[in-house]
């Protein structure tokens, strides 16, 4: 049975202060804003359990944050050593990392290439669209992130561009798409920033106070309306389709999965089958959560839930 594990080696720590970042805001309100940097001991214990469970099946490791590269190069070099040591069944291993790209240099690229990483690089388009992604000192990060992308192209590292689909990006999707094409970016993922419904899990309305706590008013300046999103989908799909018909295909993950669904194939994107994929999320201190979003809330820490309930609420199923 394939096993998918997301590790947060730097917890919520990040060198950027993106204006729309929900994770930075919510993590600041939890009892423990950061779970600290992941130790070699925690990494080793996690990988041992993963390889023991997987046997000869695939182990998929995804590193996210915060900014996972803050864990340092030695951490990822040690990762490679531990995999070689513990993967006694020679199970196939996939490694992914999601980064803002500002720390990427040539040595990082060599690490990515050597480990066969798939890198997700956050870049919201051209310099105008990327103005919401600033560092801790309020400085723009566009040129640093773009330089990281260029270095990965130089070293032949596989990477996707991850775009937070704000209102500003959606309204300028044509020039932004042309910018990505000009940079020869072949794989794009758009992550919609939509206002959440004012209802709880049972469908009952939630109070304005609770809504505002979960969704700060400043972020409403960047979130799309349903109309914004609809217009984006139409414009972007038209460009995607034209490029496909002209033999100039650029992968856009959401549309690729729409095509898979139209062909009665299973989508690979989380949530497109009507439910979240089964995944373990390991925080910097080794706490385990059932999903990435749940890791922002102390209540979902496995130490607070009886093991019998954990097993019932997050059943494992074969990964097709």
Where are these regions (language model features)?
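Disulfide-bonded cysteines in secreted/extracellular proteins and peptides
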Residues: 14, 18-21, 270, 276, ...
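Short acidic/His/Gly/Ser-rich catalytic and metal-binding motifs that mark active-site loops
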Residues: 16-20, 30, 127-131, 197-202, ...
């Amino acid at each position: 049975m394939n096993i998918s594990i997301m590790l947060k080696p730097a917890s919520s720590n990040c060198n950027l202060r993106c204006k729309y970042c929900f994770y930075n805001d919510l993590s600041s309100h939890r009892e423990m804003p950061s779970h600290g940097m992941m130790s070699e001991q925690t990494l080793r214990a996690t990988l041992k359990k993963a390889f023991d469970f997987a046997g000869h099946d695939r182990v998929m490791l995804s590193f996210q944050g915060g900014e996972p590269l803050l864990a340092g190069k030695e951490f990822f070099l040690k990762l490679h050593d531990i995999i070689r040591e513990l993967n006694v069944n020679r199970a196939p291993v996939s490694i992914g990392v999601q980064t803002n790209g500002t720390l990427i240099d040539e040595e990082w690229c060599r690490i990515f290439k050597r480990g066969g990483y798939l890198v997700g690089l956050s870049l919201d388009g051209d310099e105008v669209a990327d103005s919401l992604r600033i560092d801790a000192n309020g400085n723009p990060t566009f040129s640093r992130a773009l330089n990281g992308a260029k270095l990965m192209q130089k070293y032949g590292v596989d990477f996707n561009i991850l775009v937070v689909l704000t209102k500003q990006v959606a309204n300028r999707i044509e020039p932004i798409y042309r910018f990505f094409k000009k940079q020869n970016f072949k794989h794009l993922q758009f992550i919609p920033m939509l206002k959440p419904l004012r209802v709880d899990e049972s469908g009952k309305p939630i109070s304005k106070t609770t809504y505002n706590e979960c969704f700060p008013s400043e972020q409403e300046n960047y979130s799309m309306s349903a109309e914004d999103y609809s217009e984006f989908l139409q414009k972007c799909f038209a460009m995607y389709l034209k490029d496909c018909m002209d033999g100039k295909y650029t992968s856009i993950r959401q549309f690729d999965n729409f095509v898979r669904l139209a062909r009665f194939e299973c989508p690979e994107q989380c949530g497109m089958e009507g439910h979240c994929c089964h995944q373990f999320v390991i925080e910097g201190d080794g706490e385990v959560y059932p999903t990435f979003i749940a890791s922002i809330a102390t209540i979902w820490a496995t130490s607070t839930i009886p093991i019998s309930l954990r097993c019932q609420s997050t059943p494992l199923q074969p990964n097709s």
